[in-house]
């Protein structure tokens, strides 16, 4: 059981007023607000242990290095990875997917080979593969969905061929909220000896993720989606796979030795971390993971599911309401349209009431094309949101509806 009113005190921004209205922040799918402890960790890092990490012999450098590597261990424990060598720090989910798209394609794919994605992917899990398709001639196959917004698993099983080299799918849809059956997807792929990449950007903040249990070869997420700072993300990869893949970028830290004749690369995880790492971001991310860990991921999931069901009932009572995504298993996301009101107009007018939602295609244009629409209004909830806020949200939608 979460003490939501106590939790809200950890997030000073929630006390803000927008246009003289209390802020109702329902844009958590885009980014989450940051608890005071995370902001204080960033401040403390710059004030007390700011130094470039690794190889420094002085005290500050060694202290910063220790904090950074401790953060890596925190991520390892949070995901239940086998080794901290399997945790690569990136700038976010997008860079992590691009890293795998580049390195995996170079090492494991040739013209005519196939990657399976789904119709509900974020652009970050489409465009990197299209770049590789243009560069190397690989092919994308797409898993369709049914009218509820669930992946068509029978069709998925039929997509495999001897040229299929990777499955790359989202754990939770950022538009529909659909929680995909990723364990079943992984098992099916492994039946064909095909590795799997899971985009966990929308899953990690809301669900308990155990990469050892899932058994995916790669799993990626962003810090700012789980109450950490922007500019830091994570690539989890099975050690045997990361060992065989070539580096994504060249530069400092990812090398063992350099001469004009030859460069040898560093060991894991440093082989994939060229340049000065975001050691302040990594420690702040670790602080965010500790924070949600204290709340308990099971508690978070249960409360957010309660919010989702409450909000769904409230919105369904509004005339002209169309909610997109009716999957049996959903995360705390509602995408909708009301009558003929443009999503942008709805979002702008809700903003005047202090309500922050996301409007547009949500970086999922192929999904919008599949739905036959240009965009939606998206409300995405967090454990610091309340039913009272949902009541005000529903009243705000009704107020806007009556204006048109």
Task: Provide a role label for each language-model segment.
Residues 1-404:
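Pyridoxal 5′-phosphate
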């Amino acid at each position: 059981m979460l003490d939501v009113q106590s939790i809200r005190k950890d997030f000073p921004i929630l006390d803000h007023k927008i246009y003289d209205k209390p802020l109702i922040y329902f844009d958590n799918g885009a980014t989450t607000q940051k608890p005071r402890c995370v902001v204080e960790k960033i401040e403390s890092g710059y004030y007390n242990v700011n130094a470039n990490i690794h190889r420094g012999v002085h005290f500050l450098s060694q202290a910063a290095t220790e904090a950074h590597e401790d953060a890596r261990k925190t991520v390892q424990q949070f995901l239940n990875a086998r080794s901290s060598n399997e945790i690569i720090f990136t700038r976010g989910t997008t860079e992590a997917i691009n890293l795998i798209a580049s390195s995996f394609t170079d090492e494991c794919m040739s013209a005519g080979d196939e990657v399976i994605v789904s119709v509900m992917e974020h652009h970050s899990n489409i465009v990197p593969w299209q770049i590789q398709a243009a560069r190397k001639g690989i092919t994308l196959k797409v898993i369709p969905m049914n009218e509820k917004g669930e992946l068509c698993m029978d069709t998925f099983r039929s997509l495999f061929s001897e040229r299929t080299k990777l499955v790359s799918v989202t754990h939770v849809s950022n538009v529909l909220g659909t929680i995909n059956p990723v364990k079943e997807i992984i098992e099916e792929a492994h039946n064909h000896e095909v590795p799997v990449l899971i985009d966990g950007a929308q899953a990690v903040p809301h669900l308990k993720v155990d990469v050892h249990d899932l058994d995916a070869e790669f799993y990626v997420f962003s810090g700012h989606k789980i109450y950490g700072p922007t500019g830091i993300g994570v690539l989890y990869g099975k050690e045997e796979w990361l060992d065989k893949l070539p580096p994504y970028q060249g530069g400092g830290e990812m090398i063992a030795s350099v001469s004009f004749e030859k460069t040898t690369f560093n060991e894991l995880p440093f082989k994939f971390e060229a340049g000065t790492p975001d050691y302040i971001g990594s420690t702040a991310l670790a602080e965010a993971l500790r924070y949600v860990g204290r709340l308990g991921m099971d508690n978070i999931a249960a409360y957010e599911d309660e919010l989702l069901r409450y909000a769904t009932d409230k919105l369904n009572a509004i005339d002209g309401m169309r909610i997109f995504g009716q999957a049996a298993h959903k995360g705390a996301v509602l995408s909708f349209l009301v009558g003929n009101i443009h999503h942008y107009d709805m979002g702008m007018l809700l903003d005047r009431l202090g309500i922050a939602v996301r409007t547009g295609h949500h970086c999922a244009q192929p999904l919008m094309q599949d739905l036959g629409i240009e965009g939606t209004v998206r409300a995405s909830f967090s454990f610091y949101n309340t039913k009272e806020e949902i009541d005000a949200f529903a009243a705000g939608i009704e107020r806007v509806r009556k204006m048109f």
